[in-house]
Amino acid sequence: MFKKKSAYVLPVVVLLFLSLITTASTVGTRVDAQDSGKPQQQTVYIHTIQSENGKISITADEINWYQGADADRVFAERDPEGAAEIGGAPDGYYVVNDVDTLTTYPIADNATVTMQIYDHTGNIEDLDIQWNEAITLEQFIDQFNKTDIFDLSQFPYHLTIQDGVITSIVQQYIP
C-alpha cells in the first residue's frame, strides 16, 4: 500500500519542485519599464500618435539600431552576400526589426523632442538638416501628422522612458 502511494506522490512532488524552479528562474527576466527606477533607452519606429482624455501616447515598433562597426558586423552576420558585395552596412547604419509587435507608450507632458530634419515651411525645396533642434511636443505632433511633404514616420526615434513614460524623443537622421 505504501509503495502505491509513493508511486503517485513522488511524481507530484517532482512536478511541484520543477514548477517552483521554473517560476523562480523567470522572475526578474521580464523588462517592465514601469517598475524600473532608472531610465531606459529604446529605438522605435513611431506608427501613430494619439490623444485620449488629455493624455498623449505613441504606438511604436521597437527596433535594433546599429551604426559604424556594429552595423557592419550585424549586416555581415545577417546578409553575408550583401556585405561581401558592398563591403559593409549601407550608409553606415543597419536596422533589425525581427518582431513586429506594436507597443503603446504614454508621453510625459514635459517630454523633450529633438529633431534633425522636418518640414519647416511647407516647401520640399526648403528641407534642410538642422542638427539637434529642440521643438515642443505640440510641434512634433503637428509635424508628425503632416505627411504630404515629409513623412516623419519613416525615421527611427530614440526614446528615453522613465517609470513607463516617455520623457525624451530624439529623431535619428538617416540619409
Where are these regions (language model features)?
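Sec-dependent N-terminal signal peptides of Gram-positive bacterial secreted proteins and lipoproteins
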Residues: F2-G28
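Solvent-exposed hydroxyl-ligand-binding patches built from regularly spaced Ser/Thr
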Residues: V27-P175
